[in-house]
Amino acid sequence: MEKLEKLYEGKAKQLYATDDPEVLWVEYKNTATAGDGEKKEDFTGKGRLNNLITTIIFDLLKKRGIDSHLIKRVNDTGQLVRKVNMFPLEIVLRNVAAGHFCSRLGVEEGLPLKEPVLEYFLKNDDLHDPFVNDDDLVALDVCTREDLAEIAPLARKINEALIEIFAKIDVKLVDFKIEMGRATDGTLLLADEITPDSCRLWDQKDHSGKVEHLDKDLFRRGLGSIIPAYEEIEERLAELAKSEGIEVAE
């Protein structure tokens, strides 16, 4: 598969065409950003780790009946994915109060939620990705009621699977954001990535109750380098994947 012209560059990834019109090449960058890109720093090895982590998680989800756009990882920072028509949405699932949820609703970080909260944010840099509801999305022709009737249950199914996956490696899944799109045959697919960039992950190994971040909050809050945390997540996920018979790159 040949990598051709660059189609798009975001904060954390680059997207390239290939010699197959139905396949795209994703390159993971070493850049970390926070605060709508105002805080920015490169971390050597971040792109490699996020490529590995996304590949492992998508493979674990596939074993649990959840399909994604992933075809395969091709090198340290690259992967091949199916071309999908993306919804311009960040789909957020929250299991524990943290981040924007706390500041918006005045609740304490770490509060366990009685049930998972599903939220939508419109992908728009100029508007800082505003919070929107179902009616907003339909009124603005972002998606249809029928789309949402598929998106919501799939998002909740992904949440249940990820809670189980991360619990097996002694990590609490606090919240995460995902994206979805439709393949050319109309199938709704999980797309983009699932990494410590897009999840809040709290280590549970010492059982002390103290919050130890294994995610990008380390960078957002100036708590230290993200690389050791990302390496820890990759190593634990790799061991789990191997135990389930999934081939993992060394």
From Swiss-Prot:
Query: One Pfam family from the UniProt entry?
Result: SAICAR_synt
Q: Which domain of life is it from?
A: Bacteria
Keyword Ligase listed = yes
Reactions that this protein is recorded to catalyse: 5-amino-1-(5-phospho-D-ribosyl)imidazole-4-carboxylate + L-aspartate + ATP = (2S)-2-[5-amino-1-(5-phospho-beta-D-ribosyl)imidazole-4-carboxamido]succinate + ADP + phosphate + 2 H(+)
- UniProt keyword list: ATP-binding, Ligase, Nucleotide-binding, Purine biosynthesis
GO MF: ATP binding; phosphoribosylaminoimidazolesuccinocarboxamide synthase activity
Q: What pathway does this protein act in?
A: Purine metabolism; IMP biosynthesis via de novo pathway; 5-amino-1-(5-phospho-D-ribosyl)imidazole-4-carboxamide from 5-amino-1-(5-phospho-D-ribosyl)imidazole-4-carboxylate: step 1/2
**Could you say which EC number(s) this protein's record lists?**
6.3.2.6
What processes does the entry annotate via GO biological process terms?
A: 'de novo' IMP biosynthetic process; cobalamin biosynthetic process
Give the family this protein belongs to, as stated in its UniProt record: Belongs to the SAICAR synthetase family.
Output the NCBIfam families linked to this UniProt entry: purC
- Under which name does UniProt file this protein? Phosphoribosylaminoimidazole-succinocarboxamide synthase
